[in-house]
C-alpha cells in the first residue's frame, strides 16, 4: 500500500476514536460560556477539537486553491456557519444534524478526490449548505448564552476557521507548485482523509460505530 494511502487510513482510524459528536462541541467542559474571554476561547477551540469540523474547513481551503477563484468556498462556509449557529440559538431544529455534518464532510473529501471541474456556484452552494449544518452543530454549546459571550464565540469561530482555511489554501498551492504529479497525489490523499473522517463521523452519528 502506498505511503499516502496509509496516511489517509491512519487519519480515518483516528477519526473513529476522536470524532465524538457529543464531546466535540463542549470546549468549556459542558459549561455555558459566561464572559467574553470564555466565549472567544470556546469559539477558537471548537473547530479544532471537532475533527469533522476541522476536516471540513481544511477541505474548503483546498478547494479554494484548486478552483483559482479566491476564497469563495471559505466565505460561503463561514457565512452559513454563523447562520447555522444562530438557528440553533433561536431553537430552530435541523433533524439529524450530526449525521449531516459527517455526510457533508465526506462529500467535500469526495469532491477533492474526484477533482472534476469545479464550478464556483455549485461549490459555493455545497459549502453554504455544509456550513449551515456545521454551524448548527457548533451552536449547541452556546445556546442560552448572553450576547457578549455569544458575539465572542462567533468571532472566535470566524478567526480560527479563516486561519485553518488559509493554511490549507497555502499548503495546497505550495504542494501543487512542486509538480503536477506530486501535487495530484498529495491533494487527493488529503481529500481521501477528509472523506474518511466524514464517513467515520457519519457512522458514529448513525450509531454504526463507536
Language-model segments: which ranges?
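Residue-level signature of the transmembrane alpha-helical core
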Residues: 40, 44, 78-82, 99, ...
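Hydrophobic cores of alpha-helical transmembrane segments in multi-pass inner/ER membrane proteins
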Residues: 53-61, 104-113, 159-172, 195-197
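A small-residue-rich subset of transmembrane alpha-helices
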Residues: 61-98, 147-175, 187
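Membrane-interface helix caps and helix-loop-helix hairpins in membrane proteins
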Residues: 87-98, 113-118, 140-147, 208-209
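Divalent metal-coordination and catalytic microenvironments
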Residues: 24, 50, 106, 132-134, ...
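Histidine-/acidic- and/or cysteine-rich, low-complexity loops and terminal segments associated
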Residues: 1-52, 203-210
